Curated annotation (Swiss-Prot):
One of its GO terms (cellular component) is cytosolic small ribosomal subunit. The gene is rpsB. The lineage of its organism: Bacteria, Bacillati, Bacillota, Bacilli, Lactobacillales. This is Small ribosomal subunit protein uS2. Belongs to the universal ribosomal protein uS2 family. One of its GO terms (biological process) is translation.
Length: 256
């Protein structure tokens, strides 16, 4: 049984890699072919590796792991926030602040400041302050929420980090590796897979592809926490589409 079917991956465009000139040779084993200057990801491997990622995240969640979802590019920001929240976990979907993990003490101070400003408003302090000071506090709160709102209630440094596009999120990945935090990631054909513990070869530039993979890992968290089966699992015969179908889809898309 697979948690994501070949058909779902195809429909979401997970197979589209980058232009061949932008590839990272270390991703060669995850590439099926090249068509019209674009690398095509081997979705048979993606199906298998997505299963492994699902199991890894599910098992971590079953052991009360704190899981941080990271994706700051515009194609990933919404899905990362929505799915992490749905799973009761944490996220960073705007710029990664250097030291978010390796300088956690300082980050906690900024989070404490965010909570303090919120508390001031709730307790009515804003009502007795000058308007100019309230405006400055609101501006400070908005900035802190933008960068730290998704980890405001994170109790500790995460036990697992899920990343959309480790090529873009290199600083986040390096911080995780320095602290021994395992990294699960959607890895496109332009990325270096060496620092990724659990690789999901996938197009990380398409919103539908990011949503599909991210939602499935959120399902894994929910299943791990609840001890229940996730929404859908696919029998092997639902993946009967051959890998050649991927080539047909790519050629058709490129010719359109």
């Amino acid at each position: 049984m697979a948690v994501i079917s070949m058909k779902q991956l195809l429909e979401a465009g997970v197979h589209f890699g980058h232009q061949t000139r932008r590839w990272n040779p270390k991703m060669a084993k995850y590439i099926f072919t090249e068509r019209n200057g674009i690398h095509v990801i081997d979705l048979q491997q993606t199906v298998k590796l997505a299963d492994q990622a699902y199991e890894f995240v599910r098992d971590a969640a079953a052991n009360d792991a704190v899981i941080l979802f990271v994706g700051t590019k515009k194609q990933a920001a919404e899905a990362v926030a929505d799915e992490a929240t749905r799973a009761g976990q944490y996220f960073i979907n705007h710029r990664w602040l250097g030291g978010t993990l390796t300088n956690w003490g300082t980050i906690q101070k900024r989070i404490a400041r965010l909570k303090e400003i919120k508390r001031m408003e709730e307790e009515g302090t804003f009502e007795v302050l000058p308007k100019k000071e309230v405006a400055l506090l609101n501006k400070q709160r908005a900035r802190l929420e933008k960068f730290l709102g998704g980890i405001e209630d994170m109790p500790r440094i995460p036990d697992v980090m899920y990343v959309v596009d480790p090529h873009k999120e290199q600083i986040a990945v390096k911080e995780a590796k320095k602290l021994g935090i395992p990294v699960v990631a959607m890895v496109d054909t332009n990325a270096d897979p060496d620092d990724i513990d659990v690789i999901i070869p996938a197009n990380d530039d398409a919103i539908r592809a990011v949503k599909l993979i991210t939602a499935k890992l959120a399902d894994a968290v929910i299943e791990g926490r609840q001890g229940e089966d996730a929404e859908v699992a696919f029998e092997a015969d639902t993946q009967a589409e051959s890998i050649e179908e991927i080539v047909e889809v790519v050629e058709g898309s490129n010719e359109a």
